[in-house]
UniProtKB/Swiss-Prot annotation:
Subcellular location: Cytoplasm
Protein's UniProt name: GTPase Obg
Residue ranges of domain OBG-type G in the record: 160-328
Gene encoding the protein: obg
PANTHER family (UniProt xref): DEVELOPMENTALLY REGULATED GTP-BINDING PROTEIN-RELATED, MITOCHONDRIAL RIBOSOME-ASSOCIATED GTPASE 2
Length: 338
């Protein structure tokens, strides 16, 4: 399935039904009064967050959505039927912006959470409403009002508590595969992962925590280089970052610093997010080299460092234990209104 995390749509709420001009025409009532009914309300356009959608792919092909118009009023003071609302399903984690003003309209995080993005027009008043002492037989009614029209930008930000970050080929997909039942594509070359992968990792209590394998970031990612800016946004909702560093790389310390610089340049508090560092591919490097890298890294960061091998499953339990402790000690709410 193709991963689409941005889309722009156009929505049109329904027009209100027209009020009508009508008079009572009953036997034995020679001078019946006005009885024109009101028009029905136009349907609204409503977004609903659902769990079964993981991407905004559907909006690549369907971009125009219209709710039903209200029906015109009827005689005998009958109000016209309301137009049906147009319900649009989106994935949980979708942020909604006005495409013209960039104003944030809403953020749909919870399952079945709803948000009206275009209000249906009010129905027009029938001539029954214009009866007065001066005008006993009003010959006019009001038309229904137009429904709202808007251009909307949708932006999906993954709902994961832990984000796995690092340069391409650091072993992020291997790690999420080792920790969970997720089975991402894995190969020994950069940019194997072209979409974020989600996996549920079980705590000792049995509770599940969602981890996200964020596609490989590179220098200049905050400016859109590589897979860049589009995937940095998916880290925004996380509470904790697992930063993988490839021990077999030419300069692991520089690799670590590149990712830190990208987080800081992107802003929005990412550089302040708690981190746990995993020195990965322990099984492929001499122990003295690993010790030197660990010592050098500890000189520039106070974040906890673990020596692991995702493929050989070495050191993962200790790193996970630190992950659970970090999550338990930090607030569950992260500021995501950006």
């Amino acid at each position: 399935m193709q991963f689409i995390d941005q889309a722009e749509i156009e929505v049109q709420a329904g027009k209100g039904g027209d009020g009508i001009v009508a008079f009572r025409r009953e036997k034995y009532v020679p001078a019946g009064g006005p009885s024109g009914g009101n028009g029905g309300r136009g349907g609204s356009v409503i977004l609903v967050a659902v769990e079964h959608l993981q991407t905004l792919l559907d909006f690549r092909y369907s971009r125009h959505f219209k709710a039903e118009d209200g029906k015109r009023g009827g005689p005998n003071n009958c109000t016209g039927a309301n137009g049906s609302d147009r319900i649009i399903e989106v994935p949980r984690g979708t942020m909604i912006y006005d495409a013209d003003t960039e104003e944030i309209i809403g953020d749909l995080v919870d399952n079945e959470q709803r948000l009206c993005i275009a209000q249906g027009g009010k129905g027009g008043l029938g001539n029954q409403h214009f009866l007065s002492n001066k005008n006993r037989a009003p010959e006019y009614a009001l038309p229904g009002l137009e429904g709202e029209h808007r251009r909307i930008r949708l932006e999906l930000k993954l709902l994961a508590e832990v984000g796995i970050i690092g340069l391409p080929n650091a072993g992020k997909s291997t790690l999420i595969s080792a920790l969970s039942s997720a089975r991402p594509k894995i190969a020994d070359y950069p940019f194997t992962t072209l979409i974020p992968n989600l996996g549920v990792v079980r705590k000792p209590t049995g509770d599940g925590t969602v981890f996200a394998d964020i596609p490989g970031l590179i220098e200049g990612a905050h400016e859109g280089v590589g897979l860049g800016y589009d995937f940095l946004r998916h880290i925004e909702r996380t509470r904790l970052l697992l930063h993988l560093v490839d021990l077999t790389a030419e300069d692991p310390i520089k690799d670590y610093q590149i990712i830190q610089q990208e987080l800081e340049a992107y802003g929005r508090g990412l550089i302040d997010r708690p981190q746990i560092i995993g020195l990965n591919k322990l099984d492929a490097v001499d122990e003295t080299v690993v010790t030197q890298i660990e010592n050098d890294l500890s000189q520039i960061t106070s974040d906890p460092i673990f020596k692991i091998s995702a493929v050989a499953r070495i050191g993962l339990d200790q790193m996970l234990q630190a992950t659970w402790e970090q999550l338990d000690s930090n607030p569950s709410e992260v500021n995501i209104s950006h």
